[in-house]
Amino acid sequence: MEESGFREPVLDAKSEVTGQLIDFQWKLGMAVSSDSCRSLKYPYVAVMLKVADHSGQVSSKSIEMTIPQFQNFYKQFKEIAAVIETV
């Protein structure tokens, strides 16, 4: 049998999952100062995550995104949700 080079990704939950989401918070903010001072007064979305690793150790992660970055992030999550609904 000849392999075409295309493979659908397969996720083995036990070996691939690196953490479990414990908490998810977000806020909309407005940048009023910047080290580079190139673009002030722009809106951004801040996302704060609490994640537990395989041993139960909880760590916090935060991400700041511009509005276009957040819109792309949101679009990708909608695509994930659509795929999940077909399973």
Swiss-Prot record:
The modification N-acetylmethionine is found at M1. One of its GO terms (molecular function) is NF-kappaB binding. It holds the Pfam family COMM_domain. It is found in: Nucleus; Cytoplasm. One of its GO terms (cellular component) is cytoplasm. Residues 20-87 form the COMM domain. Disulfide bonds: none annotated. Keywords: Acetylation, Cytoplasm, Nucleus, Transcription, Transcription regulation, Ubl conjugation pathway. Scaffold protein in the commander complex that is essential for endosomal recycling of transmembrane cargos; the commander complex is composed of the CCC subcomplex and the retriever subcomplex. May modulate activity of cullin-RING E3 ubiquitin ligase (CRL) complexes. Down-regulates activation of NF-kappa-B. Inhibits TNF-induced NFKB1 activation. Component of the commander complex consisting of the CCC subcomplex and the retriever subcomplex. Component of the CCC (COMMD/CCDC22/CCDC93) subcomplex consisting of COMMD1, COMMD2, COMMD3, COMMD4, COMMD5, COMMD6, COMMD7, COMMD8, COMMD9, COMMD10, CCDC22 and CCDC93; within the complex forms a heterodimer with COMMD1. May form a homodimer with isoform 1. Interacts with RELA, RELB, NFKB1/p105. Does not interact with NFKBIB. Interacts with CCDC22, CCDC93, SCNN1B, CUL4A. Belongs to the COMM domain-containing protein 6 family. This is COMM domain-containing protein 6. It comes from Mus musculus (Mouse).
